């Protein structure tokens, strides 16, 4: 299968700790890199991950709280020091361009590349990025400020040609694309060769969903249905349910309920409150609801 990986750069929340970096992730789809959130220290973690800076062209910011975007200026500046010339696209809720432009003009006025901002409405689902391989769609969340998650959906690939059968029936090269896309082949004698004899199915397309920060929000279950991997914030244990509601965050058990109801394959929980020196309590509570749960941790790489 083609590469589809999630790299956890940081999984902490607002208050810094010595255990975790602030929230940031990188999706690697066929060696194209897409960053999700860019907390403080993200570029250091990107270095540790051994991912190539030059392959990162799109950054998706969920909301404008500092623990999700304070790393942007440092990363943008470093790209300049590395001699970057390719455009950098930053997708975010309204307001980020207004905040960063004065700092870019002051600290990074000699950049040899363009930083292009794309704003989206967090209140509705919309496609914010698309290429031949993938779409990125927003997931409306509910936090103290406008916030959304992101659904990375691989596009279905054409069927694979069975070379021996194509050679046996002497299929012309110009017919191969049609056959890959599901057409039968008709021989010069008029015999219909079923597509199933000439091809085998491609691997099913994969999906990754990122949901942070949000209060418990069952409305997102339908959009998350059947995803291969779900990252959902789990800031608090169930004993802090009132605090979770007050701050518009989620407990580990609530994150697991979302995963269970959506029928996802695997759940990763993160965005841990600094109060937990040992997050095993969060894993225990989530696993009791959805057994296939793991804890996020720095430098973790998950293959879909």
Curated annotation (Swiss-Prot):
Molecular function GO terms recorded: 3'-tRNA processing endoribonuclease activity; zinc ion binding
Catalytic reaction list: Endonucleolytic cleavage of RNA, removing extra 3' nucleotides from tRNA precursor, generating 3' termini of tRNAs. A 3'-hydroxy group is left at the tRNA terminus and a 5'-phosphoryl group is left at the trailer molecule
Active site (catalytic residues): 67
Binding site for Zn(2+) 1: 63, 65, 143, 213
Record keywords: Endonuclease, Hydrolase, Metal-binding, Nuclease, tRNA processing, Zinc
Binding site for Zn(2+) 2: 67-68, 213, 271
Top-tier EC class: hydrolase
Reported function: Zinc phosphodiesterase, which displays some tRNA 3'-processing endonuclease activity. Probably involved in tRNA maturation, by removing a 3'-trailer from precursor tRNA.
Subunit and interaction comment: Homodimer.
Protein name: Ribonuclease Z
Species: Bacteroides fragilis (strain YCH46)
Higher taxonomy: Bacteria, Pseudomonadati, Bacteroidota, Bacteroidia, Bacteroidales
This protein's encoding gene: rnz
């Amino acid at each position: 299968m083609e590469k589809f990986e999630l790299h956890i750069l940081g999984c902490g929340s607002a208050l810094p700790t010595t255990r975790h970096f602030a929230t940031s992730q990188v999706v690697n789809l066929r060696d194209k890199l897409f960053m999700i959130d860019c907390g403080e220290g993200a570029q250091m973690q990107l270095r540790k991950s051994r991912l190539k800076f030059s392959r990162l062209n799109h950054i998706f910011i969920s909301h404008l709280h500092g623990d999700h975007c304070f790393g942007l200026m440092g990363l943008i500046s470093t790209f300049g020091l590395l001699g970057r010339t390719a455009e950098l696209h930053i997708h975010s809720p309204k307001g980020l361009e207004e905040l960063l432009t004065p700092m870019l003009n002051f600290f990074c006025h000699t950049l040899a590349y363009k930083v292009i901002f794309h704003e989206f409405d967090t209140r509705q689902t919309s496609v914010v990025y698309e290429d031949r391989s993938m779409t990125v769609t927003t997931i409306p969340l509910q936090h103290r400020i406008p916030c959304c998650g992101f659904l990375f959906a691989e596009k279905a690939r054409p069927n694979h040609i069975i070379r021996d059968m194509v050679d046996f029936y002497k299929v012309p090269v110009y017919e191969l694309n049609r056959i890959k896309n599901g057409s039968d082949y008709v021989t010069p004698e008029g015999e219909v060769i079923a597509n199933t004899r000439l091809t085998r199915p491609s691997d099913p397309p994969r999906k990754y969903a990122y949901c942070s920060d949000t209060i418990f929000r069952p409305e997102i279950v339908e959009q998350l249905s059947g995803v291969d991997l779900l990252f959902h914030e789990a800031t608090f244990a169930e004993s802090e349910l009132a605090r979770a509601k007050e701050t518009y965050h989620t407990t580990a058990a609530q994150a697991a309920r979302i995963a269970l109801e959506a029928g996802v394959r695997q759940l990763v929980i993160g965005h841990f409150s600094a109060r937990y020196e040992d997050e095993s309590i969060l894993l225990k509570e989530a696993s009791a609801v959805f057994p296939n749960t793991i804890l996020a941790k720095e430098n973790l790489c998950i293959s879909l």
